[in-house]
Amino acid sequence: MRIIRTKAGGKQPSAFKNCVAEDKEKELNYCFDRKEVKDHGEGGLFVGKQLVDGEKVIIIEDVMTSGKALREILPKLEAAANVNVVGMIISVDRQEKALNSDLSAVSEAKKEFGIDVYSVVTMNDIIAAIEDGVVDGKEHLPAMYNYRATYGAK
C-alpha cells in the first residue's frame, strides 16, 4: 500500500507510516508530490518511493475544503502509474460545499471518484467542542456559524 501526501509541509509522512505499519505489522511506503516536476537531483513529480502500476494508494491531506486538492492530485497519480486509490484521510473536514455543487466535498469525492474520505474531526465537531467548553474559543463561534451558513454543504 502506498501513502500519498499532497503537501510536503507539516508532519512528515513517515510518522503516519510508522504508526500504521506498527499496528498492522506491514511495510508501507510513502511519497509526496512536488508543485512542479524537477529535472535534477532525485527528479520527477513525486518524492519518495515511486508509484507502481496496480498499487493501492491512500491519500493523506490536512484539510478538505472544496475538494480542489483531490482534483489536482488524481491526474498526477494517473500520469505516474495505474494505481488504485482506496481512500483518503483528512485531519479536518470543513464540511464545505464542493466546487460547483451543494454537496460536501467529502460526499462529492465519493460520488464523482468513488473515493471514501475519512476525517479525524469535522467543523461541526470543533463547533460542538467549543460550545460544550471542551476547548476555548467561544468568541469565534459567531464567525464560525456565519462561515458555515455561507459555505457549508446542505
Identify the residue ranges that each predicted region occupies:
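Short, well-ordered, mixed-charge alpha-helical segments that flank or form enzyme active sites
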Residues: 38-42, 66-68, 96-98, 127-128
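PRPP-dependent phosphoribosyltransferase catalytic core
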Residues: 75-154
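Short glycine-rich phosphate-binding loop at a beta-alpha junction
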Residues: 1-7
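Short, glycine/charge-rich flexible loops or terminal/linker lids adjacent to PRPP-binding catalytic cores
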Residues: 14-57, 68-72
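Fold-independent oxyanion-binding glycine-rich loops
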Residues: 33-36, 62, 92, 120
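Residue-level recognition of the N-termini of beta-strands and the immediately preceding loop/turn
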Residues: 1, 27-29, 84-87
